[in-house]
Amino acid sequence: MRAVRCSLIRGVAGLRMASSALDEMKEQMLRRWKEDQKKIDDLRKKHGHEKLCDATIDAVYGGMRGITGLVYEPSLLDPAEGIRFRGLTILECQEMLPKAPGGKEPLPEAMFWLLMTGEVPTEEQVRGLNAELHRRADPEAIAAAQKAIAALPRNAHPMTAFSVGVLALQSYSKFAAAYAAGKSNKKTYWEYALEDSLDMLARTPTVAAMIYNRETKGQVELAAPSNSDLDWAANFAKMMGYQDEEFWECMRLYLSVHADHEGGNVSAHTTTLVASALSDPYLAFSAGLNGLAGPLHGLANQEVLNYLLSMQERVKADGVNMHDEAALEKALSNYTWELLNSGQVVPGYGHAVLRKVDPRYTCQRNFCLRHKFDDDLFKLVNTIYSIMPGILKEHGKTKNPYPNVDAHSGVLLQHYGLTEQNYYTVLFGLSRQMGVLAGVVWDRLQGRPLERPKSITTEMLAKKYLCNSL
């Protein structure tokens, strides 16, 4: 009887904490919105006709690379510092965001709070948000996603299953229901978008864990039940079947640092674009996942891992001692020059914007060093890191000879036995929802309109520029 009473007391306390945290999140958002709105009004009134960039013909044909055409609030990619989440660098986030007891990595819930509000949350606010997410993990909605995924062909890709699972959750969209009933308007869209975003964040870890067990065991089910005493990342890892608390800490890091990467990448822009039509967050994020599933966006870490595994096989085939640092450096240097001289690129090195080592790479490397990784793959990636920038500088055909986040993430997962490469993009998507959903909520809060850029044809460009030059 006492145990039941204590459980009820904890349950009531958890509800109060969750409700308080949500109220505080909304208050912080509205306070920032008022500050931002004055800036937006002044910018549009005083500088509305100022040019941000010139769109060249090369840029139009080149994937719009370099064209500044979006406002996206959660994050900004700094060429010198890497990604900044609401102005904070990766290192600052690691230092300032609340952590699990005894842990050193930021909790993803804390990262979500930062992206959504622009403020670093307190430990109490993070506990409240965690309680709120556990409260919103509706078994009925999750069962609908489970049923939809189970109906897929056995060979369906995990990203197909994730996108379908999110679409199945859409049946429970509060944004869509309120809009259909005429209960929402431009001033309240953001609140319904926030409701859907919190619900999605609460339910997708269970869906993603089911997809993992479908991939490894053939059954759309959990390896362990959800545990409301655990944080978001630890609970997800345990539902996948991982009991190692060091891996839970790894997941906290992985899910936090992949949370956003400004608004122009395929998954973020797709989510933003679809949501601009007042499609609810589920529809928008499912579309973003489909973009993330493309090999040019979400498969980079798999390509790096395949490259590393091929290097590992070649080292062994050539009889190189992995523990002889000088011999390993010499062999890898020779392999790299062969690759470059054949016209290929080194996977995991270089970045479209960054001009230094990706801080997301650095924090993953530091995690491995702190936890004393000693496996061959880590030795390999660490040795490549020591020689590659010098080789690429000498080669002279790359603007950024330093590693990006993808150069390390696969090694991290392989170390803990998560070897199912097809699943890696699901982890990426689970993390990335935090940033893109924060972007969607802020678009609705700021009253952002439907996206409708102008397109042009080759024939029209030819008539304008080529005919006059003949």
From Swiss-Prot:
Similarity comment: family membership: Belongs to the citrate synthase family.
Name under which the protein is recorded: Probable citrate synthase, mitochondrial
Note: Citrate synthase is found in nearly all cells capable of oxidative metabolism.
Subunit structure: Homodimer.
Pathway linked to the protein: Carbohydrate metabolism; tricarboxylic acid cycle; isocitrate from oxaloacetate: step 1/2
InterPro entries reported for this sequence: Citrate_synth-like_lrg_a-sub, Citrate_synth-like_sm_a-sub, Citrate_synthase, Citrate_synthase_AS, Citrate_synthase_euk, Citrate_synthase_sf
Gene Ontology biological-process entries: carbohydrate metabolic process; citrate metabolic process; tricarboxylic acid cycle
E.C. no: 2.3.3.16
Alphabetical list of CDD domains matching this protein: ScCS-like (cd06103)
Lineage top rank: taxon: Eukaryota
Enzyme class at the top of the EC tree: transferase
GO MF annotations, alphabetized: citrate (Si)-synthase activity
